[in-house]
């Protein structure tokens, strides 16, 4: 506050808000909003029954709001000064960094060539498309909840449901055997459909399909029964001890 001022600017705003004469707070030894909020609301009202009277509660509330705002601004300025001081102590060597990697960055025109033709409509702006398709929200939530554990969903069910023969021995089968193998695949229901749905291709020779989509010249799916081959051709990784087995002896992908 300026030494030549009797009332702070913040307190002057309170006077204006309650329609009090300018400088009236100073007559009662209130020179800033902090002089007011040093008292509780009740204490301030009781000490100033003669003035401002019924407006005492509103005056205290406004003063408290101004005081909180000033505190926030003060702390923000302090933090800004500290951050700037820290940055000044840390030299920026960005000009010395190699820019060789910049050439490998894909431009937006290459990453999203469809943007130029998109209409500015609600679906184009707000539609959320998962990065991994097909997407199954419940399965994704289960996988996320088990992400930091060494236990799979199959292990959890096998420990809690010993009535499933498959969990007791691979040679024992029952009504839930196929379901148990589906759990072991760690694929969502929609993902399991891809390798298990019937072939709807009218072509008798699928060599071109496998060569185009999976990079191997073969007439059927049998080379991909080997996990390493399947993962390598799809450029995917399998967690240690994991499997991408769909649980069926014939996992021919649909065309």
Curated annotation (Swiss-Prot):
Say what happens when this gene is deleted: No effect on virulence in mice.
Per the record, the domain of life is Bacteria
Its keywords, alphabetically, are: Plasmid, Virulence
Q: Which Pfam families match?
A: VRP1 (PF03538)
Further notes on this entry? In Salmonella spp. the spv gene cluster is encoded on a highly transmissible plasmid.
Function per UniProt:
Part of a Salmonella virulence gene cluster.
> Which family does the UniProt entry place this protein in?
Belongs to the SpvA family.
Q: Which NCBIfam families match?
A: PRK15212.1
Listed name of the protein? Virulence protein SpvA
The organism of origin for this protein: Salmonella dublin
């Amino acid at each position: 506050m300026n030494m030549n001022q009797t009332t702070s600017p913040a307190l002057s705003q309170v006077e204006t808000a309650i329609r009090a004469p300018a400088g009236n707070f100073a007559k009662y030894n209130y020179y800033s909003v902090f002089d007011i909020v040093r008292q509780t609301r009740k204490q301030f009202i009781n000490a100033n029954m003669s003035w401002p009277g019924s407006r005492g509660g509103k005056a205290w509330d406004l003063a408290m709001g101004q005081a909180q705002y000033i505190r926030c601004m003060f702390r923000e300025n302090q933090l800004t000064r500290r951050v700037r001081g820290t940055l000044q102590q840390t030299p920026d060597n960005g000009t010395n960094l190699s820019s060789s990697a910049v050439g490998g960055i894909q431009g937006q025109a290459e990453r999203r060539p469809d943007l130029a033709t998109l209409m500015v409509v609600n679906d184009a702006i707000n539609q959320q498309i998962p990065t991994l398709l097909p997407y199954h929200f419940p399965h994704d939530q289960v996988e996320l909840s088990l992400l930091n554990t060494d236990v799979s969903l199959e292990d959890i069910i096998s420990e809690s449901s010993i009535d499933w023969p498959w969990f007791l021995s691979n040679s024992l089968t029952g009504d839930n055997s196929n379901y148990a193998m589906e759990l072991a695949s760690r694929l969502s229901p929609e993902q399991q459909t891809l390798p298990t749905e019937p072939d709807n291709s009218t072509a008798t020779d699928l060599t071109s399909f496998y060569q185009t989509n999976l990079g191997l010249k073969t007439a059927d799916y049998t080379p991909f029964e080997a996990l390493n081959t399947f993962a390598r051709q799809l450029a995917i990784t399998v967690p240690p001890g994991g499997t991408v087995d769909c649980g069926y002896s014939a996992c021919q992908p649909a065309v």
